């Protein structure tokens, strides 16, 4: 059965956890763990602070595999283009798909900020039409997932696509931290990488599909995860 190993992290919130990221990456590279892709599931920087990107670039330059990321809520949408220009080593996916051919395995990746079932107060106040934007994004993600053709399928999504990941956070705010409406989206993939919930669960399974919360403040480390084809339906019994 085909499989790949990936390294994954998120919620660096530079400068807040930048030193931790630097130290953990150095440790990872010293151990010579083999991985084929490096994933960052959003929030590289804190509150849109683009001045931190040069520091991120200096740290990640030692990574010699493709670096794929989605944006988080701290990478403000109006700054996406500038972030892409300032971080040429990172391939950012914003409701987009990417196909990587690695060791004769076709890895299909969809990346997105994700959706909230209820926009936050700040979002409702500062982003006109945010609820409609989330509905349209959800539709696009389902459309992309249906069209994705690959040996292995990976979803990178900053906001958790299930409240189960949020357990450990204040349940009062679950609807403003993730989306249960995207739970069915998970079934299209072999692995889901999410973040945002610094006090959430590290790993949950949804209909047999693993959802890893790779938030750096939660894990205190960069995770090495194996992605393999998930057997579905009757296949799972044989």
Task: Identify what each model region corresponds to.
Residues 10, 53-60, 66-89, 98-100, ...:
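Basic, amphipathic N-terminal segments that precede the first structured/catalytic domain
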Residues 8-10, 38-43, 67-73, 91-95, ...:
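Active-site neighborhood of phospho(di)ester-bond hydrolases with catalytic His/Asp-centered motifs
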Residues 57-64, 164-180, 206-218:
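Short, electropositive alpha-helical surface patch
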Residues 13-19, 45-50, 73-81, 97-101, ...:
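Active-site environment of divalent metal-dependent phosphoester hydrolases
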Residues 2-3, 98-103, 132, 183-188, ...:
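Binuclear metal-dependent phosphoesterase catalytic core
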Residues 22-24, 51-59, 86, 90, ...:
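Charged helix-capping and loop-helix junction motifs
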Residues 1-65, 76-78, 146-152, 238:
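N-terminal active-site segment of His-dependent metallophosphoesterases
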Residues 12-14, 78-172, 215-216:
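Conserved catalytic scaffold of divalent metal-dependent phosphoesterases
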């Amino acid at each position: 059965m085909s499989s790949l190993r990936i390294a994954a992290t998120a919620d660096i919130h530079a400068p807040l956890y930048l030193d931790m990221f630097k130290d953990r990456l150095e440790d990872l590279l010293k151990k010579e763990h083999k991985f084929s892709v490096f994933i960052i599931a959003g929030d590289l920087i804190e509150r849109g602070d683009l001045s931190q990107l040069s520091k991120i670039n200096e740290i990640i330059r030692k990574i010699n595999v493709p670096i794929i990321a989605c944006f988080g809520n701290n990478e403000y949408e109006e700054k996406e283009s500038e972030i892409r220009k300032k971080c040429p080593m990172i391939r950012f996916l914003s409701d987009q798909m990417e196909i990587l051919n690695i060791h004769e395995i076709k890895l299909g990746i969809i990346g997105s900020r994700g959706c909230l079932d209820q926009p936050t107060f700040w979002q409702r106040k500062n982003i006109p039409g945010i609820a409609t934007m989330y509905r349209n994004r959800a539709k696009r993600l389902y459309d992309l997932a249906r069209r994705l053709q690959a040996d292995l399928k990976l979803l990178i999504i900053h906001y958790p696509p299930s409240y189960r990941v949020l357990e450990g956070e204040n349940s009062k705010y679950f609807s403003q931290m993730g989306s249960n409406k995207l739970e069915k989206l998970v079934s299209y993939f072999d692995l889901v990488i999410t973040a945002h919930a610094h006090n959430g669960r590290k790993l949950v399974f949804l209909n047999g599909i693993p959802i890893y919360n790779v938030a750096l403040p939660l894990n205190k480390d960069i995770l090495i995860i194996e992605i393999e084809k998930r057997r579905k339906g009757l296949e799972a019994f044989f």
